[in-house]
């Protein structure tokens, strides 16, 4: 198999599990908590590092901002054998009890973006794998930091949200808004 055109990797070079932050700068910081970190590739917004965290081999791959670039990364990671994707990053809280530094574990994502419509009908919910979701909730609850579990929103217009739009999401019970989770859930 040839190298993937955007990630510049091929089968056998990556771990089965990938952390997928949007920001390449996070790919530089996450290995500070790991051992044996090694840069595998870097192209455009995509930076890939293999590392070991507490005995678990993993790959860290930035996706850039938004669902389109995340979908490219996820498609190419899956093509070379990555099986589990864990999104790590920032989000905008929609509920007053969520504070900076809290952990949010998404049980699903309202699809308010265009990428997922190319993969399935918009009526199909974007939900994570239940086994991965359960493991994340259990791990998050074992930490001393606050954790919030529930549905979120994925949007593709960072500066276009009006107060009314944000209020509607909040009243619907969505925990936060970000720009990649619906694509991750749909593609994974």
Question: Residues of each region from the PLM?
Answer:
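Metabolite-binding pocket within alpha/beta catalytic cores that recognizes anionic/polar moieties
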Residues: 1-134
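A residue-level signal for conserved active-site and pocket-lining positions in enzyme catalytic cores
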Residues: 23, 152, 188
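Short glycine-/small-residue-rich flexible loop motifs, especially phosphate/cofactor-binding loops
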Residues: 48, 74, 137, 166, ...
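Short, conserved beta-strand edge motifs with alternating hydrophobic and charged residues
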Residues: 87, 106, 148-153, 178
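Active-site beta-loop-alpha junctions enriched in small/polar residues
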Residues: 91, 157, 182
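A C-terminal functional module that forms or caps the active site or interfaces directly
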Residues: 163-187
């Amino acid at each position: 198999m040839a190298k993937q055109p955007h990630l510049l990797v091929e089968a056998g070079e990556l771990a089965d599990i990938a952390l997928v932050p949007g920001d390449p700068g996070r790919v530089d910081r996450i290995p500070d908590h790991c051992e044996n970190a090694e840069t595998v590739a870097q192209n455009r917004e995509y930076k890939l590092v293999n590392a070991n965290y507490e005995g678990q081999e993993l790959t860290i791959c930035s996706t850039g901002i938004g669902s389109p670039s995340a979908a490219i990364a996820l498609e190419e990671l899956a093509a070379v054998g990555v099986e589990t994707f864990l999104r790590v990053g920032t989000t905008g809280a929609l509920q007053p009890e969520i504070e900076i530094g809290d952990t949010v574990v998404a049980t699903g994502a309202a699809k308010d973006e265009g990428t997922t419509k190319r993969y399935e009908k918009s009526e199909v919910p974007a939900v994570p794998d239940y086994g991965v979701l359960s493991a994340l909730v259990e791990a998050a609850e074992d930490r001393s930091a606050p954790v919030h579990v529930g549905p979120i929103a994925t949007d593709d217009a960072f500066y276009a949200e009006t107060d009314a739009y944000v209020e509607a999401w909040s009243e619907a019970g969505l925990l936060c808004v970000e720009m990649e989770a619906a694509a991750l859930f749909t593609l994974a």
